[in-house]
Every structure is written in C-alpha cells, then in structure tokens.
C-alpha cells in the first residue's frame, strides 16, 4: 500500500537556480526531466546529467534492454537520490565529495525513503548505492569533534543512537522488500554496516570494505558486529574489527561478504540487471523466504518448520502461485507483475 506522504514529482533543473516542479506529463513520453542533483565542488549537477553518467539508458547500438520509464521519488534533499526503474527502487547516497559520508541531512532522508519504497507496490527490490567511486565512508568524521549545542547525559546519548540504529539498519534488515547493496567503491564503518544489513551485496572490482572503527578509536555501530559474524563467522569477524584491514572485492566474495563482483565499467548496468531479476520475481514468496531465512538463524528447527509451513500455505494460495502454475502449463515464463 502506497504511503499518502510519498511525493512523486518530475522537475526541471537549472544549474544555479531552483528546481521547477512539473506535476503532470504525457504517458509514454521519454522524459529528460528528473529531480535532484549531484554535489560537485559543493554545487548541484542536474539529476538527469547524473543519471546519464551513472545509469545510462542503452541505445539500440548497445544491444541491451533498459527501461526508459523511470519514476523519481523526491527525498527532500540532493544528498539522497531515488528512482524506480523496472521495479527496482535505486537509492543513491549522493555526497561524492565526502565519499557519501552519513550526516544530519542524508541519514534521516535515507530512513524516510526506506519507508516510502517499502510501502510502494511498484517496488519489488530496493538497491542502495553511492555516487562516484564510493558506496559510503561511514559517519562524517569532520563533524564528530563538534561540541553539542545542549549537553546530554550518557543515557540520553545511548537512547538517541539506539533509535537511530533501529530506524536505519534494523529497518533495512527487516524491510518487506528484498534489498541489495551495490558497492561501486569503498564501504567503511557504518557504511559497511548498511551494506551488511542488506540481503545481498554486489561490488565493482575496484571496491573494498573495511570496518574502519579502530582507526578513529571507536568500537562500532549500526549492527556491524551482529551482521558480520553471521556472514563470515566469529573469528574472521573479530579479525576484521580488530585490524580494520581492507578487504578487496574478490576477497569479499571468498569470505561470503559479497555475492557478485562486476567489472568497473559496467558495474551500474550489471547491478541494475541483478536487482531487476529479483524485483520481477514473486514478491510475496520472496518476502516470506526472507522472513524464513532471517528468523531461522535465531530459532530452533521446530519453530522454523512451523514458520515454513505457514508461509508455504499462504504463498500457495496467492495469485503468484496461480500465475506460476498457469505459465508452466502454457509453457511460458510467468509474469508476476504488470504495474510498470
């Protein structure tokens, strides 16, 4: 069910001026009018220019298929971009001049955007990525030494950080959609925690990951110490935390941190295709699979069997299952979605 608070707008961007909203457009028209911008020397680059650089629509000469009917979601800030393409909600951390570091503008926008795309029936998969040559460098270290305007007790600070973590990485981990972290480059600190909270991770060859916390004298946050041992085992997770070593994309695949590695030159297209395959699958069944797998880590076999039985009966009664059976009988691929 789509949130009433979601605002879908198309805008014209004029460098140096404010974006001008367009509230209607002719269906099927190839639009070059999209919202937001890319920080370059602390100025904004038009979203369409960013899109052409990072998510190019292939021409007939390339021989590949890409949708041109993308829908832009207004995140409320140029530091976070979001569009829906082929049922994939692509959320882009957009502070390349700071390696997409988290901050007081970007992070709240990310929390809110996750809620919007989760409630949008046109979204079958959520992919989080970063502008430029990084995924996310974690918290903005340049602002960590700033003194707070109002003194707070230790307990108040703990409660605040706990809430921030729960509304970001816990929300991401429990999201009703399948999530993919697409790493064009470095994922460090809390940025790595965000990637680990996703169901799947794909990386460019040049990408690397690092816990990084020891380098700034911090113990870690946003759930990395919970996610990492479940992916690679406790001993290896401890080593990565204690040493903050850089793990290349190829090493990350061997460890089980990353699912796929794509060439740098075609990374964004390959990541989009990877997410699109998931997004166009049976969303209800995939969501139930996610719950089965996540809960199975922390419950006994008996409880998992009961959960699987309930979800199998529910999915068996769904339109998705009926379409799959019909498609099998008609010897054609199933079509689970016709909304985009």
Regions found by a protein language model. Give the residues of each.
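Low-acidity, Ser/Thr- and Arg-rich intrinsically disordered low-complexity segments
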Residues: 2-9, 14, 19, 24
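Conserved CoA-thioester-binding segment of acyl-CoA-metabolizing enzymes
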Residues: 30-32, 56-59, 66-131, 170, ...
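C-terminal alpha-helix plus adjacent terminal tail
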Residues: 41, 49-50, 55, 63-89, ...
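Terminal peptide-recognition signature
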Residues: 91, 95, 110, 128, ...
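Crotonase-fold acyl-CoA enzyme core
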Residues: 104, 170-286, 313-326, 330-332, ...
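Glycine- (often His-adjacent) and acidic-residue-rich active-site loop
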Residues: 130-171, 187, 217, 300
């Amino acid at each position: 069910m789509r949130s009433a608070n979601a605002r879908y707008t198309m805008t014209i961007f004029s460098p140096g001026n404010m974006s001008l909203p367009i509230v209607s457009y002719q269906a099927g028209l190839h639009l070059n009018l999209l919202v937001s911008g890319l920080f370059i020397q602390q100025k904004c680059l038009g979203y369409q220019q960013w899109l052409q650089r990072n998510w190019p629509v292939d021409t007939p000469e390339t021989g590949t298929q890409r949708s041109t009917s993308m829908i832009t979601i207004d995140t409320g800030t140029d530091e976070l971009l979001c569009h829906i393409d082929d049922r994939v909600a692509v959320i882009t951390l957009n502070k390349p001049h700071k390696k997409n570091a988290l901050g007081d503008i970007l992070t709240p926008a990310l929390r809110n955007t996750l809620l919007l795309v989760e409630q949008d029936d046109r979204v079958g998969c959520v992919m989080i990525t970063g502008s430029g040559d990084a995924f996310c460098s974690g918290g903005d270290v340049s602002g960590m030494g700033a003194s707070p305007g109002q003194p707070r007790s230790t307990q108040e600070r703990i409660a605040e950080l706990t809430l921030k973590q729960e509304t970001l990485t816990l929300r991401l981990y429990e999201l009703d959609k399948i999530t993919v972290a697409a790493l064009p480059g470095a994922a460090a600190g809390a940025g790595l925690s965000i990637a680990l909270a996703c169901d799947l991770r794909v990386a460019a060859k040049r990408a690397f990951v690092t816990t990084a916390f020891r380098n700034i004298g911090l113990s870690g946050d946003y759930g990395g110490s919970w996610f990492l041992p479940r992916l690679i085992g406790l001993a290896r997770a401890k080593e990565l935390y204690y040493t903050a070593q850089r793990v290349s994309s190829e090493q990350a695949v061997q460890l089980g941190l990353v699912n796929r590695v794509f060439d740098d030159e075609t990374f964004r297209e390959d990541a989009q295709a990877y997410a699109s395959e998931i997004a166009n699958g049976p969303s209800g069944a995939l969501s139930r699979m996610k719950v089965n797998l996540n809960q199975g880590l922390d419950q006994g076999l008996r409880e998992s069997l009961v959960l699987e039985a309930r979800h199998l009966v529910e999915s068996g009664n769904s339109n998705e299952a009926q379409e799959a059976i019909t498609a099998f009988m008609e010897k054609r691929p199933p079509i689970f979605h016709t909304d985009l």
